[in-house]
Structures are given as C-alpha cells and as structure tokens.
Regions:
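Short coil/loop residues immediately preceding or within conserved phosphate-binding loops
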Residues: 302
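Residues located in well-ordered beta-strands
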Residues: 306-308
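Structured alpha-helical subdomains that flank or immediately precede key functional sites
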Residues: 1-6, 12-299, 312
Length: 312
C-alpha cells in the first residue's frame, strides 16, 4: 500500500502504481516503489512554467479578463490527471523511491504550495508590467527563465535535489540481490516503467452532461506548457464498468478517478450512503437524479484517483 499522506498527489500515486505492478511482475521484484517525489518535483516546475508562460500569452488582456483571473487564482496545484503522469514521466523518467524519498513537504504540500503560489503571483505581475512597458518577447522569455530558477530553488529546499544519475541494486522477491547498475532516470524508465505512456493509454470519462461516444478536451488542463490537455472519450457508465471488470479478470491495473467528495462518509468508508441519511434527516434527496447538471453548477470539479487491485 502506498500513501500520499496530506497531499493532492492521488493522480501520481495511482499512475505510478499501474507501472509498479507491471514492474514487480515482470522482474519478480520484492518490496518496490517508484519515487513519487521525483516526478512531483518536475510536475511543480512544469506547472510554474505553464503559469508564467500563460501570463506572457495573456499580457495584452486586462486583469479582469476571465483567463487572466483564472491564472492568478490558480498558479499551480498538486492535483492532476493521468495525462500529467504521462507527460511528466515521459520527459523526466523515473527513479526508485529510496533514491529520492518522501520529505515533509511532499507529504504535506499545502505550506510549500502556498509559498510557491505567492511567488508565482508576484512574478506574474512583474511579467505583465514588463510586457506593458513594451519589453520584447525574447527578453520576457529570459526573465521567465530567471524566475523559474527561483522556483527550482524553492522546490530543492522542500523536496531535495532530483538525481541525474544513480546506482541501484535490484532485489528479487526473496530479498536476494540480482544486479547493481548505474542508471539515469530515463534509462530506469526504459527498463522498469513504460516509455510510451502517452501512446499506450486512453482516458475514459462518464460525463452525463455531454454527448457519449465523443472525444473531449479541457483547455489549459495540462501539466506542461508543451504537453497534452486533459483529453477523454465520454462513455456510458455501463461501458466503463465492463472495462473495469475485464481489467480485474486479467490482473491489469486500471487507473480510475471518481468524485468521492460528494456524499462521502470517510469514517465509515461509505460513498453514496450519505444521500439516504440526508433524506431521512431533511425529507428529500439532494440532486439524486440530476447528476448531469453537476458540472453546470460547479459541483463536479475535483476527483480522487485510485487504481483497481491496489489502494493508492
């Protein structure tokens, strides 16, 4: 069992667990985890770049423009989707957990996230001021790079220095050493992970508010500026259930997200039963047959990510 502690990294833990299960089975490994801190480091750095570049791209728009407002309200977060796992891991690779372990800030992200967000907002205002003064794009890009070096340093202080090369010993299920080799994060990904995450997986969604059997893309919901937006095929829940059952039967890990924040009783581990208790208390259900309207009322904005067969 892996534990994200007090952080929003469920998407990352789940994505890594899908690859982790395959690595353990393929190489007959004993106790093994990929480092969650390593890709999280670069996820935060890439999101900082996404924000700053977004500020440059919208610098001609007024501060009360909806996009500009949204950027300053959401400079970065520790949440994400499988698209982020694919984009970050394919670019930066993977390392074992003992090479870059958890830190207090990775397990409790709120303080670090708040400080980085504060710095990014400050930097965003500086970039807008420079753009208003007529500074050329090349100079803005240079300033942005300098700003990112500050964010990099903040991440190092909180998460540690990401390794570029490391020596690691593989142990089998009996605890016996099998091999000791020198790796880079990308060579480790090639041997123990999945180099083609972007090509090998498709995201599915049950979104009752939109037409089924079509592909949808959520603009600016990505982890890298040059990455892929959150893109999914919208299917009826019955179709997704069939795929989930098939994944369980053939022991293939299936990454999934669900909107567990609604009517959740975390003490009892129940989801949905809270609706019944609310009806007993209040005399009526809360939108029990109107889930298709949830997105329109901003009632369906955050999901929880897990993998079948292994808790995240």
């Amino acid at each position: 069992i892996t534990d994200q502690k007090s952080s929003g990294r469920c998407w990352l833990f789940t994505g890594l667990n899908v690859m982790r299960a395959k690595a353990i089975a393929k190489h007959n490994l004993g106790s093994f985890e990929f480092s969650q801190t390593y890709p999280f480091f670069f996820d935060q750095l890439e999101k900082a770049n996404l924000f700053l570049q977004g500020i440059i791209d919208t610098s001609s728009k007024p501060m009360d423009d909806k996009m500009v407002e949204w950027l300053f309200r959401n400079p970065l977060s520790d949440g994400g989707t499988f698209t982020g796992v694919a984009d970050i891991v394919s670019k930066y690779g993977l390392v074992p957990k003992d090479v870059m372990p958890e830190t207090n800030s990775s397990e409790n992200t709120s303080r670090m996230a708040g400080l980085i967000a504060l710095k990014l907002r400050e930097q965003g205002l500086q970039l807008r001021d420079l753009a208003a003064q007529g500074v050329k794009p090349a100079a803005l890009e240079k300033t942005k790079t300098e700003m990112l070096s500050t964010i990099y340093r903040m991440l190092v202080l909180n998460l540690g220095v990401p390794p570029t090369e490391f020596t690691w010993t593989e142990y089998n299920a009996k605890g016996e050493p099998v091999s000791t080799e020198i790796y880079t994060p990308l060579s480790f990904l090639k041997k123990y992970g999945d180099e083609k995450l972007i090509d090998n997986y498709v995201m599915l969604m049950n979104d009752p508010s939109r037409e089924y059997y079509k592909c949808y893309e959520i603009d600016y919901d990505r982890h890298r500026y040059d990455g892929k937006n959150w893109t999914y095929v919208n299917l009826p829940i019955e179709d997704i259930k069939e795929m989930a059952i098939s994944s369980l039967k053939d022991s293939t890990m299936m990454y999934f997200s669900c909107d567990v924040g609604k009517f959740l009783n975390s003490d009892r581990g129940h989801a949905g039963c809270q609706k019944l208790r609310l009806r007993i208390s209040y005399g009526y259900f809360f939108w029990h047959e109107q889930e298709a309207t949830y997105p329109k009322f901003c009632q369906w904005l955050q999901s929880r990510h897990d993998s079948y067969g292994r808790r995240s």
